[in-house]
UniProtKB/Swiss-Prot annotation:
Family annotation (PROSITE patterns): GLUTR
Active site annotation, chain numbering: 50
GO molecular function list: glutamyl-tRNA reductase activity; NADP binding
Protein species of origin: Aliivibrio fischeri (strain MJ11) (Vibrio fischeri)
Annotated HAMAP family: Glu_tRNA_reductase
Pathway field: Porphyrin-containing compound metabolism; protoporphyrin-IX biosynthesis; 5-aminolevulinate from L-glutamyl-tRNA(Glu): step 1/2
Protein name per the record: Glutamyl-tRNA reductase
BP-aspect Gene Ontology terms: protoporphyrinogen IX biosynthetic process from glutamate
C-alpha cells in the first residue's frame, strides 16, 4: 500500500478547468462509490472546493498515480492531455505533508484562511458516510485535524485580518471594547456587506441596522442576522443611534456627508463614531474626518492594515510549516512501524504454517511405523532448509549484484554479525 494525492488548485489550473473537474454532491456520491469498489484503491477521500479538487487515497501495491489520474479524467470526461499539465502528484510523506498544509491554510489562496479546514472535515465525513475510508487514510485525516488545531493554538496564522470585510470588523473590535454593546449601521447589502454582517455576528454584535436602496435585498440580511432594515433616505434619522458605520455601495456620489454626521454627533452628545468606508468611489465624504469624535477609515487605510497582516501571517507560517514537517515525519514513523508489525505477523504466520506442514508429515511417518530417529532427523533437516532458503537466495543475489550494504543488512538480520 502507498499514500497518494493527485489534484489541481488555483495555482496550477484555470477556473475553467477547475469547474470541469469539480464534484457536485451528486457526482461526489457516485465517485466515492467507484473509489470504494475499486480493485486498485484501498481507501480514499475527495476534496472539492472552488479553488481545488484533490483525491487523497491509499493505493494497492503496484498501482501508480496514472491510474487515479486516468480515473479522474474519465469520470469528468476531460481529455487527459488537457488535464495532465495542471495535475500535481504527492506520494508518501509528501502526501501527508500536503494534506496538513492544506488544512492549516498554508496552501490557500488567502494564507492561513480557516474555512478550508471545515471543507476538509466535510470531505472526510462524506467519505466515511459512503464507507470509502479505512485504515491509514482514516488515521491520517484524524491526525491531520489534530495538527490543524495545534497550528491554530501555537501560531497566530489566522489572527490577522486579510480581507476587507474582516479588516473592517477587526478595526471595530479594536476601537470598541464590546461589539455586543454597540449599534452598527451597514450601508449597502452586497456580498461585502454580507461578509461584514457575518463577522459582526460572530463577534457578538446584537444591534444591527441595514440601509439599502432596495428593501428587498436588505431583508435577506435582516432575516439572517436579526437586523433592522431602513432605506437610504432614512439614514439621517437613524445615524445618531449608530456607534459604527460600515458602508459599501455602488453609489457614484457620497451617501453620508459632513453635515449629516455633524448633526448626529450633536444628538449623541459627541459620543465617538467609527466610519469605515469600503466603497469605491467613496460613500462617505472625506471631510467627515475633520470632525472631532468622528473617526473615518477608507479602503486604502484598510489595505495598509491588510498588507501588514499578510506579512505577519507569512511570519507565523514559518512556525506552522515547521509543525507540519515535524508532524508529517511522525506520521510516517507510525506507518513504518505499522508496516513492520504487519511484516512480522506475516513472517510468523508463514513460519508457523511451514512448521505445521512438516510436523503433520512427520506424524504421519511415525504413525506408519517409520524409525523415529530418522523421522526427527528428516524433520529438522527440512525445517532448516526451508528457513534458510529465502535468506540464502537473497545473499547470493546481493553478492552477485555487488550490493554490499544489502548483504550487510541480511547478515545482521539473520544474526551472523552479532
Amino acid at each position: 500500500m502507498s499514500l497518494l494525492v493527485i489534484g489541481i488548485n488555483h495555482t496550477s489550473a484555470s477556473v475553467d478547468l477547475r469547474e470541469k473537474v469539480a464534484f457536485s454532491p451528486e457526482k461526489l456520491t457516485k465517485a466515492l462509490d467507484e473509489l470504494k469498489n475499486s480493485d486498485a484503491i484501498q481507501s480514499g477521500v475527495i476534496l472539492s472546493t472552488c479553488n481545488r479538487t484533490e483525491i487523497y487515497c491509499e493505493v494497492k501495491h503496484g498501482i501508480s498515480s496514472g491510474y487515479v489520474i486516468n480515473w479522474l479524467a474519465e469520470f469528468h470526461h476531460v481529455a487527459l492531455e488537457i488535464l495532465m499539465p495542471s495535475i500535481y502528484i504527492h506520494e508518501e510523506q509528501a502526501a501527508v505533508k500536503h494534506l496538513m498544509r492544506v488544512s492549516c491554510g498554508l496552501d490557500s489562496l488567502v494564507l492561513g484562511e480557516p474555512q478550508i479546514l471545515g471543507q476538509v472535515k466535510k470531505a472526510f465525513a462524506d467519505a466515511r458516510e459512503h464507507n470509502a475510508v479505512e485504515g491509514t487514510i482514516e488515521k491520517l485525516f484524524q491526525q491531520d485535524f489534530s495538527v490543524a488545531k495545534r497550528v491554530r493554538t501555537e501560531t497566530n496564522i489566522g489572527g490577522n485580518a486579510v480581507s476587507v470585510a474582516y479588516a473592517a470588523c477587526t478595526l471595530a473590535r479594536q476601537i470598541f471594547e464590546s461589539l455586543s454593546d454597540s449599534t452598527v449601521l451597514l450601508v449597502g447589502a452586497g456580498e461585502t456587506i454580507e461578509l461584514v454582517a457575518k463577522h459582526l455576528d460572530d463577534s457578538g454584535c446584537k444591534r444591527l441596522i441595514v440601509a439599502n436602496r432596495t428593501r428587498e435585498r436588505a431583508m435577506g440580511l435582516a432575516e439572517q442576522f436579526n437586523a433592522e432594515v431602513i432605506s437610504l433616505p432614512e439614514i439621517p434619522e437613524h445615524l445618531p443611534k449608530a456607534d459604527i458605520i460600515i458602508s459599501s455601495t455602488a453609489s457614484p456620489l457620497p451617501i453620508i456627508g459632513k453635515g449629516m454626521v455633524e448633526s448626529a454627533l450633536k444628538l449623541r452628545k459627541h459620543q465617538p463614531m467609527l466610519f469605515v468606508d469600503i466603497a469605491v468611489p467613496r460613500d462617505i465624504e472625506g471631510e467627515v474626518a475633520e470632525l472631532n469624535d468622528a473617526y473615518l477609515y477608507s479602503v486604502d487605510d484598510l489595505q495598509s492594515i491588510i498588507d501588514h497582516n499578510i506579512e505577519q501571517r507569512k511570519i507565523e507560517a514559518i512556525q506552522a510549516e515547521a509543525i507540519v514537517s515535524e508532524e508529517s515525519a511522525e506520521f510516517m514513523t507510525w506507518i513504518r512501524s505499522r508496516q513492520a508489525v504487519n511484516s512480522i505477523r506475516q513472517y510468523r504466520e508463514n513460519s508457523e504454517a511451514m512448521r505445521i506442514e512438516l510436523l503433520q508429515k512427520s506424524m504421519q511417518a511415525l504413525a506408519s511405523g517409520q524409525n523415529p530417529e530418522k523421522v526427527l532427523a528428516e524433520l529438522s533437516n527440512k525445517l532448516t532448509n526451508k528457513l534458510i532458503h529465502a535468506p540464502t537466495l537473497a545473499m547470493q543475489q546481493a553478492a552477485k549484484n555487488g550490493e554490499t550494504e544489502k548483504l550487510t543488512v541480511i547478515r545482521t538480520t539473520i544474526g551472523l554479525d552479532n
